[in-house]
């Protein structure tokens, strides 16, 4: 048992993939309490997340660790809190809100393009840090009507610090209590102070300016009757998870395009044809976004190979059966989209970067295999911000590719499984102007 836990901590992706290759689609780990299983076949994934979603909860170490940062927000809570908060927040993610997301993304992308355009040809940037800031700015503007401005970089750093401590807690739960001033606890407290200061600033600005028009997510939270702690938890949840997922998808898309410049050129050509030009009225509506088909396919393929949420866990509240294996109530069930997205019964040449597979329907063609692609989860707990994230990622990627070519510089990055899949070092890329 100790050996298995050590290997999980050292390289979780390699360990889980090795167990899957060795034992198949249902793996029972030598962990007695709770009984722990990993399921990887899309049909079993569908059972857990869709068909029997009422028989599982998020009462797992993964989500308890994350709640140190987000509290009982939408990402970590269970019923009845989750159902009530989802009802309150759902209107903020109606398709009618996507043009506003596109508008804010267009502005944030234009700022980043201007920064890159001011550099000399051949300059090297950490593209991961740049898109982290972009994604935070879009969340702040779109959901809270708050321009984060110069604090966005600080918030991005605080988010990475807090999530790093979450991962450490999830992998080594027998740590010193939070009140003991260990280095890790001090880092966590400092990060939470930064995040809570952002919440205070967002609420103070809304108090001074009054409701947004049209209403945004912050208005809905403040009108809901939720107490200050619940409002704080949802703001932090969306500041953290709302930008981390998009930033991860964008970073890996740009890294992969840097290795496949001919595909980057196709994205740039599509963007030049579809997006408004520099002198045009910057109106980006849903039909415009829908025309960015190649760009969307690149985002999809980047999230297939590097799913932002690489690990999904659930606690069973009833007995289940997968591929003939009995899983008792009270078990921990692990799903790794990293593995599911490579399942050979669905994906051809699963390790290859082939965005065109999403233009032909491979892997997502029918109801029986929709759970073969789960970058945002599936079923009732599917990410509420899925369409928001797609609009932002697709538009930002198109805007960047139209303006610059980005090619790898320095040692290649590897996937580092933290709360999301991150590069294991700065994602250094060389800028060439188009």
Predicted regions and their residues:
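N-terminal membrane-proximal hinge/A-helix region immediately C-terminal to the signal-anchor transmembrane segment
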Residues: 1-84, 103-114, 149-150, 186, ...
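Conserved cytochrome P450 K-helix E-x-x-R motif and the immediately C-terminal K′/meander segment
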Residues: 5-24, 281-323
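Conserved cytochrome P450 K-helix/beta-meander segment immediately N-terminal to the heme-binding cysteine loop
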Residues: 335-364
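Cytochrome P450 proximal C-terminal region
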Residues: 20, 109-112, 160-161, 272-274, ...
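Cytochrome P450 I-helix active-site segment
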Residues: 1, 102-106, 157-161, 211-219, ...
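Cytochrome P450 heme-thiolate monooxygenase catalytic core
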Residues: 1, 57-63, 81-83, 97-248, ...
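Cytochrome P450 catalytic-core helices
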Residues: 245-270, 387-404
């Amino acid at each position: 048992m100790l050996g298995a836990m050590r290997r999980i901590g050292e390289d979780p992706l390699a360990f889980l993939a090795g167990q899957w290759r060795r034992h198949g689609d249902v793996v029972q780990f030598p962990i007695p309490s709770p009984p722990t299983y990993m399921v990887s076949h899309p049909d079993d994934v569908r059972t857990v997340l869709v068909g029997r979603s009422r028989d599982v909860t998020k009462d797992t170490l993964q989500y308890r660790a994350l709640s140190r940062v987000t509290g009982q927000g939408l990402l970590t809570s269970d019923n009845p809190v989750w159902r009530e908060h989802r009802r309150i927040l759902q209107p903020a993610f109606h398709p009618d809100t996507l043009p506003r997301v596109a508008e804010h993304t267009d502005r944030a992308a234009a700022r980043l393009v201007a920064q890159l355009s001011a550099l000399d040809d051949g300059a090297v940037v950490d593209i991961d840090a740049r898109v982290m800031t972009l994604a935070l700015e879009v969340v702040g503007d779109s959901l809270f009507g708050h321009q984060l401005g110069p604090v966005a970089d600080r918030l991005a750093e605080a988010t990475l610090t807090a999530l790093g401590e979450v991962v450490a807690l999830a992998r080594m739960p027998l740590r010193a209590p939070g009140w003991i001033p260990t280095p890790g606890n001090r880092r966590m407290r400092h990060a939470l102070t930064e995040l809570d200061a952002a919440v205070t600033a967002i609420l103070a600005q809304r108090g001074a300016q009054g409701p947004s028009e049209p209403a945004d997510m912050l208005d809905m939270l403040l009108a809901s009757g939720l107490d200050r702690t619940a409002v704080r938890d949802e703001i932090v949840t969306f500041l953290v998870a709302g930008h981390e997922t998009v930033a991860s998808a964008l970073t890996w898309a740009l890294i992969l395009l840097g290795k496949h410049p001919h595909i980057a050129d196709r994205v740039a050509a599509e963007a030049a044809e579809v997006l408004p030009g520099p002198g045009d009225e910057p109106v980006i509506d849903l039909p415009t976004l829908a025309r960015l088909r190649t760009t969307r396919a690149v985002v999809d393929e980047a999230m297939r190979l590097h799913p932002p949420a690489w690990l999904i866990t659930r606690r069973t509240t009833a007995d289940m059966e997968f591929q003939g294996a009995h899983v008792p109530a009270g078990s921990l069930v692990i799903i790794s989209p990293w593995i599911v997205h490579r399942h050979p019964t669905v994906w051809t040449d699963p390790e290859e970067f082939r965005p065109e597979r999403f233009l032909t329907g491979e892997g997502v063609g029918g109801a029986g295999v929709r759970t073969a692609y789960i970058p945002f989860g599936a079923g009732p707990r599917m990410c509420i911000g899925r369409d928001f994230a797609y609009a932002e990622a697709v538009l930002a990627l198109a805007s960047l590719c139209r303006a610059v070519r980005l090619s790898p510089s320095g040692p290649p990055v590897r996937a580092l499984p933290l709360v999301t899949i991150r590069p294991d070092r700065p994602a250094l890329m060389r800028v060439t102007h188009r």
